């Protein structure tokens, strides 16, 4: 069992989703997911309790990011106050003592000059050489001018050579 503080949160990337991460990794996690906005809900002393709370909340919130929608900024507006209350009211009473009081919305701006219209994923196993103009970075994705996107995280361990002009 990981005996370090863990946070259960709501993040808005392609849609509102629930997640859990170590307290020390919170902003890194949200940025990796391409979250535009995020908010802490609960703080637990260990991963196990946080995971149990997340399972409860997965009954009313997704725990997956729709990466294509996230990259295309294709999302609806949400009311954070309503969604937070919905989440907290759904939890069993014995979890209420873990609520993060006065939690604020954290907002992120990603450097994207061109939002892709039709996302094409770059697969380095199929396409050994790719040339493109970088137009943005969002979450773990590099976005190129021709709507090609490269998922850096899913290519961990792959040797890549980048040339800039």
PLM ranges: what are they?
Residues 1-165:
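Non-catalytic accessory segments flanking enzymatic or RNA/DNA-binding domains
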């Amino acid at each position: 069992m990981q005996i370090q503080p863990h946070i259960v949160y709501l993040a808005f990337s392609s849609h509102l989703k629930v997640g859990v991460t170590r307290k020390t990794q919170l902003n890194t996690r949200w940025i990796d997911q391409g979250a535009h906005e995020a908010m802490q809900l609960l703080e637990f002393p260990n991963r196990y309790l946080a995971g149990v709370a997340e399972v409860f909340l997965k009954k009313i919130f997704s725990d997956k990011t729709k990466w294509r929608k996230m990259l295309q900024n294709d999302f609806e507006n949400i009311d954070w106050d309503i969604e937070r209350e919905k989440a907290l009211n759904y939890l069993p009473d014995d979890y209420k003592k873990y609520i993060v009081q006065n939690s604020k919305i954290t907002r992120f701006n990603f450097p994207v000059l061109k939002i892709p219209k039709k996302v094409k994923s770059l697969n380095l196993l199929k396409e050994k050489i790719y040339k493109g103009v970088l137009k943005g970075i969002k979450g773990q994705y590099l976005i190129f001018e021709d709507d090609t996107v490269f998922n850096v995280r899913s290519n961990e361990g792959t040797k890549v050579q980048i040339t800039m002009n």
